[in-house]
UniProtKB/Swiss-Prot annotation:
Its main location: cytoplasm. This is Sesquiterpene synthase 1. Belongs to the terpene synthase family. Tpsa subfamily. It is an enzyme of class 4 (lyase). The gene is STS1. Binds 3 manganese or magnesium ions per subunit.
Length: 561
């Protein structure tokens, strides 16, 4: 943003432009080609679908059998969820967990009920469903000094269940804070001593990606690969999980082919070569928000919104001049296609698809007989996002580093969490009521927690790369300036509000005024995917290594049957 000029016909050659040096797309036409062959169902596909339905009936019988103990049922539910199959049995699982909830205190509160795995697993399953049950049940596993009993260390599966349960803690739950420290220490020790045991893979995975912070497809893919090692595994579940994963993968391949064709037709690679070409990575992110086949419409809409947001972010962050960025923010605020010719040519290439995407969603919803007010809420959220983008560029232009608190007042909006949350509701159907959108517009705990996680995680992993060029101030610089500390100290200190934000999200999921769980899950899942992609580096921007491997696993390589 070196030269302040006004342009209405595209940037003239004399205008100085920044470049972030983003690597090009690593996928090319890969998914367009693969979807062409996958779009037609084969006899093999039909046989697999028939097989899935037969296996589904067997599993349903297991869930509804009246002679199964509660302990066996909760273990069955856990396996079903980890294998990515719970969307097939939502009603059955809900009924069973309601029964567990009603008998929870009586059943698990007894001092002689000392099965740590049983108690911790039940606690986690209920908290996941939004039941605000007490963590006091774990006090019986502590000694007279309030410390967890050392003999628990021998129960590795129980320790692992307690570790996973501790990640659903809310503010003030000291017993779960102690549980997390206790289990983390001893599970690491277990790994060092037993690196090749049957439970080692599960423990190793949990320590890196706790279930609460992981998303379905990657949890399922991993659990399918290790499930056969455990003496409690059930072959019917494993067969169904493999079959289901591959069938869902084909659904995603077809959708990705459509999305990739849409993106290719927009020709951003040639029209806006400075921007990140990451439509496949966006789709991967959004399958983490909703992977189930029934969510095709919201998946398509949110992928398009996120992909276009990425382009507009790069216009603000990398390429635009101050006057052009004001024009773009003003155009987004007006949300009016008639002003298209007043914009710089390169800006038009992003502005028109943005308006078209929202208009198409609105038309589709109207044709389906659904209310369209959600589109208006999403537009307003996008307008606030553009205002925040503009404010950050003004800081850059003035070479101004705000205080950490001032930075967050803008950066929590520019993180995009609220806009993505609102947009994730838009195509969810009648469950996304006006009241749900109003609730989200008031920045509840779960939504604010998402914004904190996105913003601070992004700033930490992207700091080194972004410091190589003129860039808007990040949380790292602002924290260093406000507290006069090194960047290493800033990195460590910024983890604290991220931990707090996860507790906020957990608490928000238990709030009685929160909307239905299917909506809350979208917000939570946005954070889960980010936690996976931003593991040590920005796996969205720099997607040619680890992210490439993950996407290959998710969308290209089927599971051998």
């Amino acid at each position: 943003m070196a030269v302040y000029v006004n342009s209405t016909t595209g940037p003239p050659p004399s205008v100085g432009r920044n470049s972030a040096g983003f690597h090009p797309s690593i996928w090319g036409d890969k998914f367009i080609t693969s979807s062409n062959s996958a779009v037609q169902k084969t006899d093999v596909d039909r046989k697999e679908e028939e097989k899935l339905q037969l296996l589904k009936q067997e599993v349903k019988k297991m869930l509804t059998a009246g002679d199964t103990s509660q302990q066996d049922l909760i273990c069955l539910i856990d396996d079903i969820q980890r294998l990515g199959l719970s969307y097939h049995f939502e009603a059955e699982i809900d009924t069973l967990l309601q029964h567990v909830k009603h008998s929870y205190v009586e059943h698990y509160g007894k001092k002689n009920h000392d099965n740590l795995h049983d108690v911790a697993l039940s606690f986690r399953l209920l908290r996941q469903e939004g039941h605000n049950i007490s963590s006091d049940v774990f006090s019986k596993f502590q000694d007279s000094d309030g410390k967890f009993k050392e003999e628990l260390v021998e129960d590795v599966r129980g320790m692992l269940s307690l570790f996973e349960a501790a990640h659903l803690r809310v503010h003030g739950e000291n017993i779960l804070e102690d549980a997390l420290e206790f289990t983390t220490t001893h599970l690491n020790s277990y790994l060092n001593s037993n690196p090749s045991s049957s439970l080692a893979d599960l423990v190793r995975r949990a320590l890196k990606y706790p279930l609460r912070k992981s998303f379905n497809r990657m949890v399922a893919r991993h659990y399918i690969s290790v499930y056969h090692k455990f003496d409690w595994h059930k072959q019917v579940l494993l067969d169904m999980a493999k079959c289901d994963f591959n069938l869902v993968q084909k659904v995603h391949q077809n959708e990705l082919g459509y999305i990739t064709r849409w993106w290719k037709d927009l020709d951003f690679t040639n029209k806006l070569p400075f921007a990140r070409d990451r439509v496949v990575e966006c789709y991967f992110w959004i399958t983490g928000v909703y992977f189930e086949p029934r969510y095709a419409a919201p998946r398509k809409f949110l992928t398009e919104v996120m992909s276009l947001t990425s382009i507009i972010d790069d216009i603000y962050d990398v390429y635009g001049t101050p006057d052009e960025l004001v024009q773009l923010a003003d155009a987004i605020d007006k949300w009016d296609i008639s002003i298209l010719d007043q914009l710089p040519e390169y800006v038009r290439h992003a502005y028109k698809p943005l308006l078209d995407t929202f208009a198409e969603a609105e038309e589709e919803m109207a044709n389906e007989g659904l209310p369209t007010y959600g589109v208006d809420y999403a537009k307003e959220a996008f307008k606030r996002l553009a205002v925040a983008y503009l404010q950050e560029t003004k800081w850059l232009q003035a070479q101004y580093i705000p205080t950490f608190e001032e930075y967050l007042s803008v950066a929590l909006v520019s993180a995009g969490g609220n806009m993505l949350s609102v947009s994730s509701f838009v195509r969810m159907g009648n469950i996304a009521t006006r009241e749900a959108f109003e609730w989200l517009s008031k920045d509840p705990l779960i939504a604010n927690g998402l914004s904190v996680i996105i913003r601070l995680s992004d700033d930490i992993v992207g700091h080194e790369f972004e410091s190589q060029r003129p860039h808007i101030p990040s949380a790292v610089e602002c924290y260093m300036k406000s507290h006069d500390v090194t960047k290493e100290t800033a990195y460590a200190e910024l983890q604290k509000p991220i931990i707090k934000a996860w507790k906020d999200m957990n608490e928000g999921c238990l709030h009685p005024e929160a909307p239905p769980k299917p909506l809350l899950e979208r917000v939570l899942n946005l954070a889960r995917v980010l936690n996976f992609l931003y593991d040590g580096h920005d796996g969205y921007t720099h997607s040619s290594t680890r992210t490439k491997d993950i996407i290959t696993t998710a969308f290209i390589n089927p599971i051998p049957l």
